[in-house]
């Protein structure tokens, strides 16, 4: 009897898994994968009626128990973290800023919980019930402005209306010098006559010893529970002061003002700072950031968070139809004006720009332009750009070498002010601009047309002027403008005045009466619509290089470079066939073709196996995957567009 091929395949997989389980070097992850494969094979065999239902139930239960034993185990030797791999795979490319996280779970927040407060109240009641005597001491004198008790003694005034239990006082252990400062009272209350004598005899002692008592009390309670400490030793400020006034008015004595103790206030401020909650609102965090940012500047006040001090919102001031609108969030100009008023003349040197050429440029524009500097990312080499040998050779001669050796390339050998890269989309114009900056060691500015435009009249030309001023301070510099046709399009009658002024300022800064021939600033523009560029801009962009579609050798280089990073099985003849069939594809189209072919092995996997298969079990990329990809990916450039580029290159281009 001949066994079907499918049964032989399942038998082979079952035997291979059995050998994996029997080996002594099998990891928990491998065991779990084997048991998952067994469960899937059991379901598949039962669905095809290859085994009976009873056998399927028995085998499924057997291997499900073994699988759950591995998954549910907490031991690292035999257990498996079933979620770590997928989570780490998703999170490995994400930025991790856990050092800036702030936990809101603090001791202060826990003590505010109702259950914790109930436990504290129950504990105090139990402690009071166990006390041998229920003595009450009236507190009235020696209270500073922070609400902290600074004047407790053997006998104090009783008219404040605030009672401190003896159990609370017994918890406070004083140093040797103040051991007799707080003692257990022998009677529960005092008469008015005794109070008069107490006020005359112990007031000086209380005032003189307030500093030593409060400092000792803070040290003795440093490590205790903040809740019990605050509940026993902090008194209500309003009731205490009112009781003090009543006591002195009843006795007929003149009240003497006791100034707050600066030592106690400093200690209380530090105590409150340590107990501060970890959570901060956006307003508080902004205030803290401003304090940190300007902490090194003397006599500086925090800038207003929402508007200036003289501005108001809501019904605080009436505004008619012609009233001035006050924004809820201050503009950058308002914040800078208020900061300049607060800093005074002492910080004029600190606020001065580092370069004299930037002193007339607004700081916000300088910051915006500096944020456009591309000084990050992997460096690019000329070999990373497939094909385009004529364009790369020309750029090396007229751009890279003059920037590397400005002493040799002087006079007529000097580099041009601008280069225009035109051609179909997806041919590598942006890569050439980045490679120019990397190979020449220049500062690379990647500017879009939207970065130089503004809705405010006059801001656009200021931004263009600031761009070239900052570039002159960072020479050699390369200003790359992608889709330059949107910025320097042809000027017409119906054009807006602000757009015309931006173009005029750009052309003047690029090559005008105020520019210097010694400036090593190169403007590289890329476009796929060269016919829409203004004539004056076309004259200033001296070198106009046509970036055509990749040739056969360039397409082969793209395929080989992309497939070298993947698991594929392509022969040399198959690669040649793919290159010939991809005639008319741009560089971006070739990349999309390889992406689509790389998904072919994934699409061949059945849906029920996608959750159990390992990356090693995915078959390599084959020639049939590229054939399927050609049915989906089409060239993005038509023959009519290619003829347009060819004609414009013959008229205005610099050869090929």
Curated annotation (Swiss-Prot):
GO terms for biological process: ATP metabolic process; microtubule cytoskeleton organization. Residues 293-302 have a biased composition (Polar residues). GO terms for cellular component: nuclear chromosome; perinuclear region of cytoplasm. Hexamer. Belongs to the AAA ATPase family. The N-terminus is necessary for its recruitment to DNA damage sites. This is Fidgetin-like protein 1.
């Amino acid at each position: 009897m001949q066994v079907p091929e499918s049964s032989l395949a399942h038998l082979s997989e079952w035997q291979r898994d059995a050998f994996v389980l029997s080996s002594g070097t099998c990891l928990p992850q491998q065991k779990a994968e084997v048991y998952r494969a067994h469960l899937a094979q059991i379901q598949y065999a039962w669905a095809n009626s290859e085994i009976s239902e009873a056998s399927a139930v028995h085998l499924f239960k057997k291997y499900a128990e073994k699988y759950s034993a591995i998954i549910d185990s907490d031991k690292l030797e035999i257990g498996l973290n079933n979620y770590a791999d997928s989570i780490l795979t998703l999170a490995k490319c994400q930025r991790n800023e856990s050092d800036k996280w702030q936990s809101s779970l603090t001791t202060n927040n826990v003590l505010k919980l109702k259950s914790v407060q109930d436990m504290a109240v129950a504990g105090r009641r139990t402690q009071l019930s166990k006390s041998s005597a229920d003595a009450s001491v009236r507190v009235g004198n020696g209270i500073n402005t922070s609400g902290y008790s600074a004047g407790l003694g053997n006998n104090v005034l009783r008219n404040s209306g605030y009672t401190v239990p003896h159990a609370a006082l017994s918890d406070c252990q004083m140093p040797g010098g103040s051991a007799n400062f707080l003692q257990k009272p022998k009677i529960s209350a005092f008469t008015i006559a005794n109070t008069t004598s107490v006020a005359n005899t112990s007031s000086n002692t209380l005032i003189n010893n307030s500093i030593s008592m409060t400092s000792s009390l803070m040290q003795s309670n440093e490590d205790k529970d903040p809740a019990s400490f605050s509940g026993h030793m902090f008194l209500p400020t309003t009731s205490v002061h009112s009781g003090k006034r009543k006591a002195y008015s009843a006795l007929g004595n003149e009240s003497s003002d006791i100034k707050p103790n600066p030592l106690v206030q400093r200690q209380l401020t530090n105590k409150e700072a340590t107990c501060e909650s970890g959570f901060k609102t956006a307003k508080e965090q902004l205030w803290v950031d401003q304090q940190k940012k300007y902490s090194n500047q003397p006599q500086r006040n925090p800038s207003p968070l929402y508007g200036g001090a003289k501005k108001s919102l809501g019904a605080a001031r009436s505004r008619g139809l012609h009233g001035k609108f006050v924004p809820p969030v201050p503009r950058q100009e308002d914040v800078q004006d208020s900061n300049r008023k607060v800093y005074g003349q002492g910080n004029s040197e600190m606020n001065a720009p580092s370069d004299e050429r930037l002193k007339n440029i607004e700081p916000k524009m300088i910051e915006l332009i500096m944020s456009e500097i591309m000084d990050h990312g992997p460096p690019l080499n000329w070999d990373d750009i497939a094909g385009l040998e004529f364009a790369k050779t020309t750029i090396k001669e007229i751009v890279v070498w003059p920037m590397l050796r400005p002493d040799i390339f002087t006079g007529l050998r000097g580099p041009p002010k601008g280069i225009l890269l035109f051609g179909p989309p997806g041919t590598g114009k942006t890569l050439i601009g980045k490679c120019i900056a990397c190979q020449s060691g220049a500062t690379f500015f990647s500017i879009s047309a939207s970065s130089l435009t503004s809705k405010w009249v006059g801001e656009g030309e200021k931004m263009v002027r600031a761009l070239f001023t900052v570039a002159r301070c960072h020479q050699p510099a390369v200003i790359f403008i992608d889709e330059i046709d949107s910025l320097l399009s042809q000027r017409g009658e119906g054009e807006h005045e602000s757009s015309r002024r931006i173009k005029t300022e750009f052309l003047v800064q690029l090559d005008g009466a105020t520019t210097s021939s010694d400036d090593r600033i190169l403007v590289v523009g890329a476009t796929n619509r060269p016919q829409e560029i203004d004539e004056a801009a076309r004259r200033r962009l001296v070198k106009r290089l046509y970036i055509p579609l990749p040739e056969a050798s360039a397409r082969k280089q793209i395929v080989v470079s992309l497939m070298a990073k993947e698991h594929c099985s392509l022969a040399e003849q198959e690669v040649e066939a793919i290159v010939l069939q991809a005639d008319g594809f741009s560089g971006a189209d070739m990349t999309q073709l390889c992406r689509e072919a790389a998904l072919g092995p994934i699409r061949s996997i059945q849906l029920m196996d996608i959750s159990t298969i390992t990356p090693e079990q995915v078959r390599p990329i084959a020639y049939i995957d590229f054939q399927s990809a050609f049915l989906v990916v089409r060239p993005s450039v038509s023959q009519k567009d290619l003829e347009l580029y060819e004609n414009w290159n013959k008229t205005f281009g610099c050869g090929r």
